[in-house]
Structure formats: structure tokens, C-alpha cells
Amino acid sequence: MAPGEVTITVRLIRSFEHRNFKPVVYHGVNLDQTVKEFIVFLKQDIPLRTNLPPPFRNYKYDALKIIHQAHKSKTNELVLSLEDDERLLLKEDSTLKAAGIASETEIAFFCEEDYKNYKANPISSW
């Protein structure tokens, strides 16, 4: 990998209530691209991944949030932490590096509307 390129894991969250998610590993991610550019890349790449079930390939993902950064503590939340949105939700106009993404970072890709609904009423179905 070239300098400035890292490996990150993207957790595709289909349902917060049912804890339905799939991790996808990306190698060679350029940290100098904007969050918006990375979202566009993910939206183009995910539907082409035949190893993902159709419900994950065809979902309306639109937001990214940091789940875990390498060598830092993890939360006890099974799908995604509902705290620290100001710091962990990625803003589209910043670069991945400025947003805090580094090698081995795990981020969530989800529908922001679903996240807000779940945050307002965090009940799991099982």
C-alpha cells in the first residue's frame, strides 16, 4: 500500500433493532479523500459485492460513524454506540484523516433516519 492508504473495516448496518449487520474489509483506502467521496465509492461498491446478501447490497446507506479505532477501547454496544455523535459521526466535507480515520479503524455505514429512530427508542427485538 502507498503512504496514506490504510485498511479499514466498514460495518454495514441493515437494522439496529434486529442487530443485523455485515462487516466488509477495504484495503488501500486513501485517507486524503473526503468522507463524501468515500460514501460515493461505498454506494457504488456494495451493490457489486456478490458475497453480500441482497438486503445488504440494496439498502439505503447514507451516514458513517466511527465504531472503534485501533489501540483504543471498545464500547459494550453490540451494533453501534449511541453516544459521542458530535465527535464520531463523519462530516461529509472533511477528509477521512481529519475525521479521525486511521489504519484498522472500524466504521459503521447505515441509514441516518434509522439511526435517529433507534436512538430515540433503543429497543432491540431480541
From Swiss-Prot:
Species per Swiss-Prot/TrEMBL record: Homo sapiens (Human)
UniProt superkingdom: Eukaryota
Taxonomic placement: Eukaryota, Metazoa, Chordata, Craniata, Vertebrata
Protein name, entry field: UPF0538 protein C2orf76
Similarity comment: Belongs to the UPF0538 family.
PANTHER family reported for this sequence: UPF0538 FAMILY MEMBER, UPF0538 PROTEIN C2ORF76
Pfam name, any one: DUF2340
